[in-house]
Structures are given as structure tokens and as C-alpha cells.
Amino acid sequence: MIGYTEVIQTMAAMIIFSMILISANSMIQRNTSMQIDGELEQEVISLGQEIIEEARSKSFDEQTQGDMPPSIIPGGFTPTSEFPTGEDQETRERSEFIAFEDYHNWSEIITTPHGDFNISVEVYYVDETSFEKVENQTTFKKIDVTVTSEFLHGGNEPKIYKLEFIRNYYAE
């Protein structure tokens, strides 16, 4: 009988040890996944912020370049209907942009050591009090930078990261 008891105790110890190993392995895998997601999210924010900072360095409007601002503000600003279309942006490089609205409808796939990131930009006028999108010219423009990556998911759906910035003509 003594031999069977030792065998059963050994088997029980092996089962307990296996459960501990499975739990530890699961915890290590979860921590690694969280670390990788954190690094990718940091890259997403960096890329989006880079676009916003670059756009902020440009003129508020194509009509505000040079020494003389438009005589009618905000009516003299570029109408939304004259912002670049998706077709316009297919042939343009970011280095050619001279005004804030030039980023409208721009999109690109940027490759980094962390993978490929899809970036798209929308620029539009916003109401001066509610900051909601409007069609007429105002002294406020908003830029939305959307960044996605095939490696970042929320469940089965890809995560969409949206960075925003509101620019005021008078704050330049």
C-alpha cells in the first residue's frame, strides 16, 4: 500500500505543478501582449501627433499667407468646397502642403520598425462655441488624424485611434 500512496502523491504534485506552470505561462503571455500593445499605441500617438504638429506649422489658411490677410474674416478664408479632394491628394506629397487645409483628405501608409500604420486626415471648419463641424468659414478649423494598424485590435475589430486638434486663426 505504501507504494501506491507515493505514486498518488507524486501524481497530485505533478498536477498541481502543471496548473501553476499553465497559470504562469498565461500571465507571461498576457503581460507580453500588453507590453507590445503599449509600444504600438505609443507609435500611433507619435505618428498622429507628428502630423498635427506639422499641420500647425503651416498657415491657417491658403488665403492668409504672405503679408496681407484677407480683407473679410472669416469670409475670405478658403471655402470648404475648395479643400483638397481625395483625388487631389493622390498626386501630392506632404512636403508640398503650405496651409492647414492642405491636409484635408490626405492619407498614407507609413512603415516603421513596428509595422505599417494607415493614416488619414480630415480638416474642416468648426463652430466657435460648440466646436461642431460646419460648412461655412469660421476662425476655427479642426484636424482629425485617424491612425490604424493591422496589429492593434479591440476584440475582433481593428482599433481606430483618432487624434484631434482645433486651431484658431487669432491664436497664431
Regions found by a protein language model. Give the residues of each.
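Low-complexity, Gly/Pro-rich coil/beta segments used as flexible assembly/activation regions
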Residues: 42-172
